[in-house]
Design a protein with these regions (language model features):
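Conserved ABC ATPase signature
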Residues: 108-112, 116
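H-loop/switch region of ABC-family ATPase nucleotide-binding domains
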Residues: 169-170
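Catalytic Walker B motif of ABC-type/P-loop ATPase nucleotide-binding domains
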Residues: 133-136
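C-terminal boundary and immediately downstream tail of ABC-type ATPase nucleotide-binding domains
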Residues: 197-217
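Conserved ABC ATPase "signature" region
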Residues: 89-104
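A short, surface-exposed alpha-helical micro-motif characterized by mixed small hydrophobic
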Residues: 175-177
């Protein structure tokens, strides 16, 4: 699928200006960049949460699922929170088991820890099939064991459903583990894109090299 090029301006300052982009189906495209590079704004615009300056659709005819950085559970059980995005108890049980929160199914979601809430939110978004699944820092609150389980589930979902996954992440290691393609943002602009391992192992742009060196890659 392809996005149109677009810009986003805040208080007279252009914070994001991107060209037309391809987001392949059946693949995970990771978006990396320093804080303030425009990653989350990009995600919100694609998801329709915010509007680009052009005030026209960035994607057309595409169903989009969006998982924000921070999720706020409803005042109901963990299982019922997950079922708000699809009435399929068997699927909910499968997802909760995969992320090791099955024992919390009947517990009030308001009592979950940050990591447990993140796992519940990921289960909830994966209840439905989408053409494009946008995940904004989905594992930040998780420990490493849960992160690896979540990554496995995301990869399996992508492969089984053929959806395109756009993964916003601050973790270069995470991008290396599960991403097929990589987009690198710097100060609101796309400075590099390509096959993930190729970009990480042999970046073509100086700003990409500096970013990777700063994060110790």
């Amino acid at each position: 699928m392809k996005t149109t090029g677009f810009t986003k301006t805040y208080n007279g300052r252009v914070v994001l200006s991107l060209p037309e982009l391809s987001i392949p189906k059946g693949q995970i495209t990771a978006v990396i960049g320093a804080n303030g590079s425009g990653k989350s704004t990009f995600a919100k615009i694609l998801a329709g949460i915010e509007r680009a300056d052009e005030k026209k659709p960035i994607l057309s005819g595409v169903s989009v699922g969006y998982l924000p950085q921070k999720s706020f559970p409803f005042r109901m059980s963990t299982e019922k929170n997950i079922l708000t995005n699809g009435n399929d108890p068997a699927r909910a049980a499968e997802l909760m088991k995969a992320l090791d929160i099955g024992m919390l199914a009947g517990q009030s979601a308001k009592k979950l820890s940050g990591g447990e809430t993140a796992r519940m939110a990921l289960c909830r978004i994966l209840m439905r099939r989408y053409d494009l699944l946008i995940l904004d820092e989905p594992t930040t609150a998780m420990d490493m064991e849960s992160t690896l389980s979540a990554e496995k589930l995301i990869r399996e979902t992508c492969g089984e459903t053929g959806c395109a996954v756009l993964l916003i992440t601050h973790s270069i290691s995470q991008a290396r583990r599960i991403a097929d393609r990589l987009l690198v943002l710097h100060r609101g602009k796309l400075i590099e894109q390509g096959e993930c391992q190729q970009v990480l192992n042999a970046p073509a742009q100086e700003e990409t090299r500096r970013f990777l060196e700063f994060y110790g890659l």
